[in-house]
Curated annotation (Swiss-Prot):
GO terms for biological process: rRNA base methylation; tRNA methylation. This is Probable dual-specificity RNA methyltransferase RlmN. S-adenosyl-L-methionine binds at G207, E208, S239, S262, L263, H264, N347. Binds 1 [4Fe-4S] cluster. The cluster is coordinated with 3 cysteines and an exchangeable S-adenosyl-L-methionine. GO terms for molecular function: 4 iron, 4 sulfur cluster binding; metal ion binding; rRNA (adenine(2503)-C2-)-methyltransferase activity; rRNA binding; tRNA (adenine(37)-C2)-methyltransferase activity; tRNA binding. It comes from Roseiflexus castenholzii (strain DSM 13941 / HLO8). SUPFAM superfamilies: Radical SAM enzymes. Specifically methylates position 2 of adenine 2503 in 23S rRNA and position 2 of adenine 37 in tRNAs.
Length: 399
């Protein structure tokens, strides 16, 4: 990445960084009544205005001052790619200083989910992930996180004005097929998506959210605000590689955000080889924090498990994973009614000497877990053809 010079506009306050209370303070400092802040907030997140000059319920002088003394960034992606008949849309954003981040909008029959990035690059170094090859370039500001959701909301509003579009019916839990199957003879039927707005957010894009917890959480609060985007807390999911302090902190928050933990191995030796963070927070420590989280919140945790051909997808790996979660191998077990394993066949990343698990191995792994009382599904990936699937985001950079 070539760093770009920071301009004077880049140093102006980003309106997407501000909560409603902070916006009220800004505008009252300008001599405006507090209700003006509510108008601006509504324009940003309900009307989805892309410039203060479009906020026509404000006095012209205030619109001009907002345009001159604040900014909205990033507003427009540099590139949008589509896949899955337009139902998957990946946006590439360029941030001040030139850093690139990606977001993915996935439209389903009954929901629209946006996968959001929290960092440009990532320092975690998981060996199967494209983002990790970049290293950490920088953390995103709260507003740069929020802006990705605003982009997705605009996309949904724009698409809602078109004729009904086909979507793919979700498969039964036992069904799984490859991306090639999806393009050729996918087990899907034409349906009409009735969704016209973003319904779900997954913080599973580029970066580790808990490594920039304060900024990420400020974004969550802005996104959740019922006077704006109004995305319910239970409709948001955050994924972590296993930063234990973040898991413990999330357990104390008032908003019930869903938690997903990237596991990917049933023992410390293999997990440390795949995920360097395991050397800092080994499985016993991670499961202890997860157990405390479950006790404090009563909310289900999803364990994500990327299946790598011949690395972590053997039947003995499945049996060891079940034993780990049940408490039969070292750490005390977890309450299984609050545990869900999400199997993810690895999505190819150019230059990585890894393989995607074959279908039969995936289904065998799933069967072994289920036979041992572990709830388990296989993720049907979206956007593989445009490098928008799990583990493929690299900010438009060829790996």
């Amino acid at each position: 990445m070539t760093a770009l010079p920071v301009t004077n506009r880049d140093t102006l306050p980003n309106l997407y960084d501000l909560s409603l209370a902070e916006m009220e303070r800004l505008l009252t400092d300008w001599g405006q009544p507090t209700y003006r802040a509510r108008q601006v907030f509504r324009q940003l997140y309900v009307n989805l205005a892309d410039t203060p000059l479009a906020m026509t319920d404000l006095p012209l002088a205030l619109r001009e001052r907002l345009a001159n003394e604040t900014r909205l960034a990033p507003v427009t992606p540099e590139q949008v790619q589509t896949a899955d008949n337009g139902l998957t849309r990946k946006a590439l954003f360029r941030l001040p200083n030139g850093a690139l981040v990606e977001s993915v909008l996935m439209i389903y029959l009954d929901r629209a989910t946006v996968c959001v990035s929290t960092q440009a690059g990532c320092a975690m170094g998981c060996v199967f992930c494209a983002t990790g090859t970049l290293g950490l370039l920088r953390n995103l500001s709260p507003g740069e996180i929020v802006a990705q959701v605003v982009w997705a909301a605009r996309e949904m509003r724009r698409l809602a004005g078109r004729p009904p579009r086909p979507t793919m019916r979700q498969p039964e839990d036992d069904a799984w097929w490859s991306p090639d199957d999806l393009e050729n003879d996918a087990p899907s039927v034409p349906e009409v998506s009735s969704v016209s707005h973003v319904t779900n957010i997954v913080f599973m894009g580029m970066g580790e959210p808990f490594a920039t917890y304060d900024r990420w959480w400020r974004a969550v609060e802005i996104i959740h605000d019922p006077r704006g985007l109004n995305i319910g807390a239970r409709s948001m999911t955050v994924s972590t590689v296993g930063l234990v302090p973040g898991i413990r902190r999330l357990a104390t928050e008032t908003l019930p955000i869903n938690l997903a933990v990237s596991l990917h191995a049933p023992d410390d030796d293999l997990r440390s080889a795949l995920m360097p963070i395991n050397r800092r927070y080994p499985l016993a420590v991670l499961l202890d924090a997860t157990r405390d989280y479950l006790a404090a919140t009563g909310r289900r945790v999803s364990f994500e498990y990327v299946l790598l051909q011949g690395k972590n997808d053997e039947p003995e790996h499945a049996a060891k994973l079940a034993a780990l979660l049940r408490g039969e191998a070292g750490p005390a077990g977890l309450p299984l009614h609050l545990v869900h394993v999400n199997l993810i066949p690895w999505n190819p990343v150019p230059g990585m000497p890894l393989g995607r698990s074959e279908r039969r191995r995936v289904l065998t792994f799933q069967r072994i877990l289920r036979e041992r009382g572990i709830a388990c599904t296989v993720r049907v990936e979206r956007g593989v053809a445009i490098a928008a699937a799990c583990g493929q985001l690299a900010g438009g950079v060829a790996c």
